[in-house]
């Protein structure tokens, strides 16, 4: 019933265990974080977020691969983790402080659940009054037709390392003109930060691995 918050290894393992087969207590017993701290649960993070009331927690819903393959078991575990996270968020009254960014994987979960991970995640987030962004680079019109209001995209497909990319002809402005919320990630170089900061009043978020530098430019 707990949701663990962690960046899994390449094989989707946490402390060399498959998290969908173990409890939080078992995952914690198998090891700590690199700094010695206990492996955190979603509730642990939400407690901190709510204490200050100034931070928004984004949860990245991955497509869990098992032995390097996307499987029915893995897709169901991904969708169910998001659904359980939404239940915890609602129980803790954190709907305005937690949002999801969801894998763009378009494979149906299973024959008994003929929808995708992102469809299940969007429905779960919407049901509790939270938001979910879709990490799939495609025609902005697809977002509208699927009822997905928010695109979370890599800078590599738009403007990256000082160069205009606009993959498939889709630019920052095209997503904005479609009426979508747009957030971007991996704006790490100065030139890229400067480019996206020109849109700072229109973008939903600009994500970077160097937040102090970005905030310095922002201000």
Regions found by a protein language model. Name each.
Residues 1-114, 156, 178:
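Metal-dependent phosphodiesterase/phospholipase catalytic core, i.e.
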Residues 4, 116-118, 173:
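N-terminal non-cleavable signal-anchor helices
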Residues 6-7, 120, 185, 209:
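Generic beta-sheet signal
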Residues 35-37, 126-219:
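C-terminal active-site rim and adjoining tail of enzyme catalytic domains
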Residues 94-135, 183-186:
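Aromatic-lined carbohydrate-recognition surfaces of secreted/lumenal glycan-active proteins
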């Amino acid at each position: 019933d707990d949701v663990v918050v962690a960046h899994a290894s390449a094989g989707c393992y946490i402390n060399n265990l498959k998290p969908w087969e173990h409890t939080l207590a078992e995952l914690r017993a198998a090891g700590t974080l690199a700094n010695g701290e206990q492996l955190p649960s979603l509730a642990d993070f939400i407690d901190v977020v709510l204490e200050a009331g100034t931070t928004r927690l984004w949860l990245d819903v991955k497509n869990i691969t098992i032995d390097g393959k996307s499987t029915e078991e893995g897709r169901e575990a991904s969708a169910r983790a998001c659904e359980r996270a939404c239940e915890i968020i609602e129980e803790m009254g954190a709907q305005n402080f937690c949002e999801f960014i969801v894998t763009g994987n378009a494979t149906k979960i299973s024959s008994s659940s003929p929808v995708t991970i992102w469809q299940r995640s969007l429905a779960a987030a919407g049901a509790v009054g939270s938001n979910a962004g879709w990490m799939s680079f495609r025609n902005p019109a697809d977002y509208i037709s699927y009822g997905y209001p928010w695109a979370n995209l890599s800078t590599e497909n738009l403007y990256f390392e000082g160069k205009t990319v606009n993959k498939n002809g889709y630019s920052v402005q095209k997503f904005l003109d479609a009426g979508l919320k747009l957030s971007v990630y991996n704006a790490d170089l100065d030139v890229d930060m400067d480019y996206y900061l020109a849109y700072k009043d229109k973008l939903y978020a600009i994500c970077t691995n160097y937040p102090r530098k970005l905030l310095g430019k922002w201000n």
